[in-house]
């Protein structure tokens, strides 16, 4: 509002086109805190819980590990970068001599800040699997290293840390090992519905398949569980089309600050689903307090 203002009008004189300037009313607003109403989570008659139960019941029918045996070709590309890199090279007397560095700049998946890729490692291999007796074998056919990766490839330090981070995971297992810790899978046959809260968010198209977007969070935010999304097909097979896994910010993973895993699956002619694409992103330190590194597989 505005402060009240009185103006004297003189009779016998023109008073049209009169401009009156009003001063806004000055007032203070005390601090206002808005808190959303916290709804109680219930598992009974919860469509999200019923959906995840059906996904778990069908997981052995849909995953390729249910087959007696299979083999596949695997291509992996691991890039290691300096995180939160300042792209303004002109202010750095040393780096401004190397203008080509800008060609190796990328963007972090975590915060959108620039990163500088310093090494790239590529592997091409054949993977063999047998269900009973269970056996797995990987034969490397070709490998290539670029950048400072050869310096790091000493069987220890950064190399061993990266190997520990990027160990292959199976979302359908009851437990998923991450850095010597065992995380409960959101598809665990034994603990899923008691360990996690599930929420149906939306229906959407994922790679040509209509899916339910199912969000999940640990019931206890300090437990070793993931936050993320499951995209479940709506064709009656309850197959996992895509999964996003994030480690919670308030748990201790030693030298790892952030970790995200993305997997996307495709259906084969025999109706089983196989892993088609996988991306793992991680922020970590070699030594706490030093330059943070960013890795992407």
Map each language-model feature to its residues.
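Intrinsically disordered, low-complexity N-terminal regions enriched in serine/proline/glycine
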Residues: 1, 127-128, 237
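Periplasmic N-terminal soluble interaction domains immediately after the signal peptide in Gram-negative
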Residues: 1-44, 260, 280-293
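Extracytoplasmic
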Residues: 2, 15-17, 29-31, 67-69, ...
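Phosphate-binding glycine-rich loops and adjacent basic patches that engage nucleotide phosphates
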Residues: 12-21, 160, 223-228
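Structured extracytoplasmic
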Residues: 26, 38-213, 217-225, 288, ...
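Gly/Pro-enriched, hydrophobic low-complexity segments
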Residues: 43, 183-191, 198-205, 209-297
């Amino acid at each position: 509002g505005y402060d009240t203002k009185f103006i004297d009008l003189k009779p016998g004189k023109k008073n049209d086109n009169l401009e009156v300037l009003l001063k806004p009313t000055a007032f203070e607003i005390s601090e206002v805190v808005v808190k959303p109403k916290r709804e109680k989570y219930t598992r009974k008659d919860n469509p999200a819980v019923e959906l995840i139960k059906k996904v778990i019941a069908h997981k052995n029918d849909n995953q390729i590990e249910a087959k007696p045996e299979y083999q596949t070709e695997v291509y992996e590309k691991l890039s290691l970068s300096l995180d939160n890199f300042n792209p303004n090279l002109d202010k750095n007397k040393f780096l401004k001599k190397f203008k080509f560095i800008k060609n190796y700049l990328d963007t972090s998946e975590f915060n959108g800040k620039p990163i500088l890729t310093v090494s790239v490692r590529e592997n091409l291999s054949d993977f063999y699997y047998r269900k009973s007796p269970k056996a797995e074998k990987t034969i490397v056919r070709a490998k290539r290293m670029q950048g400072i990766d050869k310096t790091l490839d000493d069987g220890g330090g950064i190399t061993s840390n990266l190997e520990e981070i990027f160990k292959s995971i199976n979302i359908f297992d009851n437990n998923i090992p991450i850095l010597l810790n065992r995380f409960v899978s959101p598809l665990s046959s034994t603990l899923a519905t008691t360990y996690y809260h599930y929420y149906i968010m939306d229906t959407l198209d994922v790679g040509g398949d209509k899916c339910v977007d199912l969000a999940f969070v640990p019931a206890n935010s300090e437990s070793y569980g993931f936050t993320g999304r499951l995209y479940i097909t709506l064709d009656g097979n309850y197959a996992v089309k895509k999964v996003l896994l994030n480690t919670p910010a308030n748990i201790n993973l030693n030298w790892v600050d952030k970790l995200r895993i993305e997997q996307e699956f495709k259906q084969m002619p025999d109706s089983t689903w196989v892993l088609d694409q996988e991306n793992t992103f991680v922020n970590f330190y070699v030594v706490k307090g030093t330059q943070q590194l960013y890795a992407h597989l």
